[in-house]
From Swiss-Prot:
Entry keyword Cytoplasm: no
SUPFAM superfamilies: Ribosomal protein S5 domain 2-like
Transmembrane segments: none
Name of the protein in question: Small ribosomal subunit protein uS9
Gene: rpsI
Classification lineage: Bacteria, Pseudomonadati, Pseudomonadota, Gammaproteobacteria, Pseudomonadales
Gene3D superfamilies linked: 3.30.230.10
GO BP: translation
Length: 130
């Protein structure tokens, strides 16, 4: 348990988040903007706060995040993953409740590539028998 700050890297789809936890009052800063400014969508804000609410550390830390790549939901998921990892670095006993909630596991689902001769990844052109 370091006194200055804890770090966690989170990933989801093509988004990557670098998360720094410092003792503070509960401010969340993402790319030098507030949480409410960065995410217009309430669901994305809820996803980011989930690990803090679960471990009851909402007002215990100031969180500084740098996130790149992906879209809104991917970035929110990456930040959640990063916060989870930083919390585990801060206190190893938080691992088991976070694991039970499913926040520790990296969501491995990625976009499937488009194949040659198909319209999308799996959608085929219409078949004509005659």
């Amino acid at each position: 348990m370091s006194a200055t700050q804890n770090y966690g890297t989170g990933r989801r789809k093509t988004a990557t988040a670098r998360v720094f936890l410092r003792p503070g009052t509960g401010k969340i800063s993402i790319n030098n903007r507030g949480l409410d400014q960065f995410f217009g969508r309430e669901t994305a804000r809820m996803v980011v706060r989930q690990p803090l609410e679960l471990t009851e550390t909402v007002e215990k830390f100031d969180i500084f995040v740098t996130v790149v790549g992906g879209g809104v939901s991917g970035q929110a998921g990456a930040i959640r993953h990063g916060i989870t990892r930083a919390l585990i670095e801060y206190d190893e006993t938080l691992r088991s409740p976070l694991r039970k909630a499913g926040y520790v596991t990296r969501d491995a689902r990625e976009v499937e590539r488009k194949k040659v001769g198909l319209r999308k990844a799996r959608k085929r052109p219409q078949y004509s028998k005659r």
